[in-house]
Structure formats: structure tokens, C-alpha cells
């Protein structure tokens, strides 16, 4: 069974991605209390590969995942792609369609289930803007991907 709302991994990833730096103290303290690993970052691109690379690099540098363990990187990759599908409304294309994104991202890793035997999960939240590569013509977007490790 899932933990109570404050222990839900996707919810926490979305909140971390949404909060500005000056607002995030409460959520990071909560994640520390849960003993979950997390990181934040920003990426702007017209290419999916750059989004994936930015999230993976941040997660490795902040010890959210071990870059030498295939299963951890594979779980992260699928969570990122699922989140991008939300951002792009299921059409995982950017530059070819003359779309660009400016995103904040959060990666959260932990055990969102009351039964610890369910294992660790990873969530990737993306929040920002998407649109034509003309400043001011974009709109807000959000995506969430969750995968087991």
C-alpha cells in the first residue's frame, strides 16, 4: 500500500520541481527526514537527448543513482522519457516540430510503500515552458515519470 500523501514519491518530485529556490526548504527537509535522495536542475533545449543527459548527469553527480549500475540508469531513463511524454503531450519530438522547452527538473528516489520489500522507486518531474522558439510565445507544461529500480 502507498504511504500517506506526504510519502508519495511523484507528489514530492512535482513539488520539488515547482518550488522556487527560496521555497524549497520545507520539501527538502521533508525528503531528508524520509531519507530519500533527490536533486534539482534546469535544462533548455530543442533536443530530447539533451534533456535526458541533463537529468542523468544531475542524478549521478548528486548520488541519486549509481552511474555504473545498469538497472539504476535504466529506471532513471524510463522515468525521464515518461516525464517528457507528459511535457510534449505524447509526441516526443521537439526540434523537428520547431518546439523548444525550458524546464526545471527534480529527481527523487525512495521507498514510497509501507512494505519496504516493495523496494526503491525513482520519480522525475519536469516543469517549465514549451512552444515555438520565440520568447514569449510558449506556455506552461508539466510531466511526471515514475519507475521502480
Swiss-Prot record:
Q: Which InterPro entries match?
A: Regulatory_HutP, Regulatory_HutP_bacillales, Regulatory_HutP_sf
Superkingdom of origin organism: Bacteria
GO-annotated molecular function: mRNA binding
Pfam families xref list: HutP (PF09021)
Q: Which UniProt keywords apply?
A: Activator, Histidine metabolism, RNA-binding, Transcription, Transcription regulation
Tell me if RNA-binding is a UniProt keyword of this record.
Answer: yes
- Provide the GO biological process annotations: L-histidine metabolic process; positive regulation of gene expression
| UniProt keyword annotation of Transcription present | yes
Q: Describe its function.
A: Antiterminator that binds to cis-acting regulatory sequences on the mRNA in the presence of histidine, thereby suppressing transcription termination and activating the hut operon for histidine utilization.
Would you identify the family this protein belongs to, as annotated?
Belongs to the HutP family.
Instruction: Tell me the NCBIfam families matching this sequence.
Output: PRK03065.1
Q: Which HAMAP family match?
A: HutP
Q: What is this protein called?
A: Hut operon positive regulatory protein
Organism listed in the record: Geobacillus sp. (strain WCH70)
Q: What is the lineage of its organism?
A: Bacteria, Bacillati, Bacillota, Bacilli, Bacillales
What would be the name of the gene that encodes this protein?
hutP
Amino acid at each position: 500500500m502507498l504511504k500517506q500523501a506526504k510519502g508519495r514519491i511523484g507528489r514530492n518530485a512535482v513539488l520539488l520541481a515547482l518550488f522556487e529556490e527560496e521555497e524549497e526548504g520545507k520539501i527538502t527537509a521533508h525528503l531528508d527526514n524520509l531519507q530519500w535522495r533527490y536533486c534539482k536542475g534546469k535544462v533548455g533545449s530543442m533536443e530530447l537527448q539533451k534533456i535526458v543527459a541533463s537529468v542523468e548527469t544531475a542524478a549521478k553527480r548528486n548520488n541519486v543513482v549509481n552511474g555504473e549500475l545498469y538497472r539504476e540508469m535504466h529506471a532513471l531513463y524510463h522515468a525521464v522519457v515518461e516525464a517528457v511524454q507528459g511535457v510534449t503531450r505524447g509526441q516526443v519530438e521537439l526540434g523537428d516540430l520547431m518546439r523548444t522547452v525550458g524546464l526545471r527538473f527534480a529527481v527523487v528516489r525512495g521507498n514510497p510503500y509501507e512494505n519496504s520489500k516493495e523496494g526503491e522507486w525513482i520519480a522525475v518531474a519536469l516543469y517549465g515552458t514549451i512552444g515555438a522558439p520565440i520568447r514569449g510565445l510558449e506556455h506552461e507544461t508539466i510531466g511526471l515519470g515514475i519507475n521502480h529500480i
